[in-house]
Structures are given as C-alpha cells and as structure tokens.
Amino acid sequence: MDTIKAEEISQIISKQIRDYEKKLDVSETGTVLSVGDGIARIYGVENAMAMELLEFPGGIMGMVLNLEADNVGVAVLGDVTHIKEGDIVKRTGKIAQIPVGEALLGRVIDATGEPIDGKGPLGATEFSRIEMIAPGVIKRQPVNEPMYTGLKAIDAMTPIGRGQRELIIGDRQIGKTAIGIDAIIRQKDTGVKCIYVAIGQKKSTVSQIVENLRKHDAMSYTCVVAGCASDPATLQYIAAYAGCSIGEYFRDRGQDALIIYDDLSKQAVAYRQISLLLRRPPGREAYPGDIFYNHSRLLERSARVSADLGGGSLTALPIIETQAGDVSAYIPTNVISITDGQVYLEPSLFFSGIRPAINVGLSVSRVGGAAQVKAMKQVAGTLKLDLAQYRELASFAQFGSDLDKATQAQLDRGVRLVEILKQPQFQPMSLAEEVIVLFAGTRGFLDKYEVEKIKEYEPQVLAYMKSKHQDIMQEIDDKKVISPELEQKIKEALTAFDSVFVAG
C-alpha cells in the first residue's frame, strides 16, 4: 500500500492556493416597488438605459421603457405572476436584441427570437438590436426596381418597387393578409427573402398561415415572427421591430427582402396599453403622443440603400385595419402619410365577388411607377383611367337605357376589365402571364365574349401560350419590353387562340 507523503500533500495544497482565482460577480441591482398588468416599477437601477433588458428572479426578462427621477418603468417580457414586490432585479447592460441571419429562414420565432415551431435551437451566430436608426438620405437610392406581388390589379395599377412602403388598408376579413401571403409566394426563385410579422393574431391563424406558406414551398425563404394575442402587450409591440431587424440583415448585405406587418393597428393598440399603464399622458383616441413616431421610425427602416452600401433593399407592406371603412381615423391617416402609397380594399367590392377587392380610385403608388417595367406600362398604361371612367359611366348608365354605341362599348370593355383583374388566392402570376392577360383585355380580344366566359378564358389562354408559344412568354420575362415585332406575335397568337377557345 502506497504511503501518502507529507511533502506531496503540501505541494498539492500550495498549488491549489497558487491557482485559486477569486471571482466576484459585480452587478447593479434594484428592487421591485410594484408590479401588475405586465408593468413593474424598479427602484435602484440608476444607470439603466432605455430599451435595456433587466433580469428578474427565475430568468424572466423585462425591458426598460420609462426612466423617471426615482424609479424606472419596466415592461415584463414573460409571466408577471412570478414577480412580487421586493424582488431583486439585475441589470444586464444589454439593449434588447434578436438573432438574425440565414438560420432564421424556414423558422417561426417569437418577438424575443426564441423558436416556437418545435424544431430545436435556431443556430444563429449573429445578433442585431431591435431598435436601429434608419438609413440617412445620402445612404439611400431611388426606388427603380420592381417588386412583383403576382396580383394583376396591383402590378398593373399600383406597382410596388424594391425599397418602397406600400400600405394595405381595409376593413376586417376582406383579404388584406391574402395579398401579403400571395406577395410572399410570388417571391419564389427570385432570391427575395421574406419576413411575415404576425401582431396580435390568434395562434391558430398564425399556424394556418405557416401551413399555407409551407404548402406553396415559401417557408424556405421566409421567417415568421409572431407576437400573438395571448402574448404580453410588450411582445406584440416589439415584434414589428424584431422582424425589421431580421430584414435589415439581408438589406445590409446587398440582398432584397420583403416584410409584411400584419397588422400595425394591433401594434398601436398594444403600445397604447403599455403607455397608459406606464402613466404616460394620453392624446387623441387615448394613443400616446409619440404613436406617429412609433410607426414612422419603423417604416423608415425600409429603404433601397445606395450602391456603395451594397444596393440591398427592404420593402415593407404594412397592413392597417379600418373600422367601417373609416380611413380618416387617427392611425390610418398617420400610416397613409408615412407610406409611399396604399392599396385600399373595399367591403362592397369584396362581397360583390371582386377579389382582390381593390378600390382603384383610392389606391395609389407614389414611387412605384418608376419601378414598373416597360412591358407592363405598355399593356396597362391606361387601365386605371379606363376603369375610373367605366365606374363613372356605370353610375350614370343606371338612370337611362338609351346609350350611344361608344358609351355602351366603353361599359362593355369596363365589365371585362373588372373580370380579368379578379384572381383566386394562392395563385400569384409571373410577369409574362400578367402581360398576356392584360394585353388581351386592354386590346379588345375579350370584347366578343360573354362576361361569364372570361373566367374560363384566362387559364386556357395561359395554358395555350405556355404550350404553343413559350418563346413569347420567355421574351416578355427576359426583355421586359414589348417590341413591335413581339406585339405582332402576341396578336397573332391570341387570334389563333380565339378559334381554339370558340371551338372548345
């Protein structure tokens, strides 16, 4: 049996003493003065920063929103029932941030960046603050590249460019989200990364949207950020900023990204709730005074950055829900004034079967015209005017039956144009498909058919063009302009199709 030598013991002890490193964990702490309704008042964290994360017992995090003389107002980002008066709160020294990068594509996360799709950790290595300063004037370049939505009515009459902010506004349940989802599906194989931000929605609704995106192979280039109705108001409020930071990651690397905020009305309500609980003075409709700044600083982060910075873009499609079509309410007017145009959806059109239910007269794209390709301008240049004149004539025509031939022809053409602008959900179209259908409508190829036939005409003419005239479709997609020779080819192809369609 080995004997233990005294020298060895002394050597071991002296080595341990030598290697001993005293670790002191110094952190600034505070005490919970009061807590309730998702808001905690903390005394003692004198050096806390705005938007800084504080740690409550049990690992619950809170975000500093109010900095007052003797305490700070903190919005709790978790279950407030586990926090009680007198609890010790630690400063983290970190401003609220979120994981970003390619690893988030195909995933569903909450507003703090935690995965909620049951697929394990994200594996993201980079982080970004949720609040970033928007690019300055010099760092931007004009919007001049198209961002196709795949919807004929939008791409023809209110075109959207990369880096634009186009508002989708309308009452509840009339297809606002459907436009956003179709726009995401249309980005397949274009290299555009998509972010869908669900704010204040039911979890079942978010689940359904994710399933629809998966069904159409759109999740591979999409990240869903969910601040659901059951989440604390703070998470619903910061979800939009978190989603924007993910989009900025791609924008700042020279890529193109598209973000859908669904919807900013619920975000405003969540922010109003937080502000009132923090005892901030209420303004119009009880919203706080900085609600405009809340939306403007979010939407200004969507931009097309200059070529020196990579030339990337972040396009935003914010959604606003109106009450009984009132676009002159506080939040709708705010967001209309911030964005570069709006697509206005009307219940009366929706219920009469015109879907997407876009009101052409009230919808506008302030900067997208410069991004619209020449081929689309050639076929849809007068479409908006034609439809506006048709609506005006239609309202007069109901008072009298004796109309001259020209007026009757204009009315007939208008009915057919309205018909070809209808489009089913989850069926976004390519540029060539849109151009062919609109060419047929605006050049009078549909005038000879009954209105009921138009619905059958569109899928059949597209199938015919793809099988017999793929070269024409390819040329439209590649050159994005209709030359006189190509126009002649399209006319001949559509004339040839007429005999097939009539016979069929």
Curated annotation (Swiss-Prot):
Where does this polypeptide localize?
A: Cell inner membrane
Topology term for the membrane: Peripheral membrane protein
Recite the UniProt keywords alphabetically.
ATP synthesis, ATP-binding, Cell inner membrane, Cell membrane, CF(1), Hydrogen ion transport, Ion transport, Membrane, Nucleotide-binding, Translocase, Transport
GO (cellular component) term, any one: plasma membrane
Entry EC no(s): 7.1.2.2
| Chief location bin | membrane
Q: Which family does it belong to?
A: Belongs to the ATPase alpha/beta chains family.
Q: What is this protein called?
A: ATP synthase subunit alpha 1
Phylogenetic lineage: Bacteria, Pseudomonadati, Thermodesulfobacteriota, Syntrophia, Syntrophales
The UniProt gene name for this protein comes to atpA1
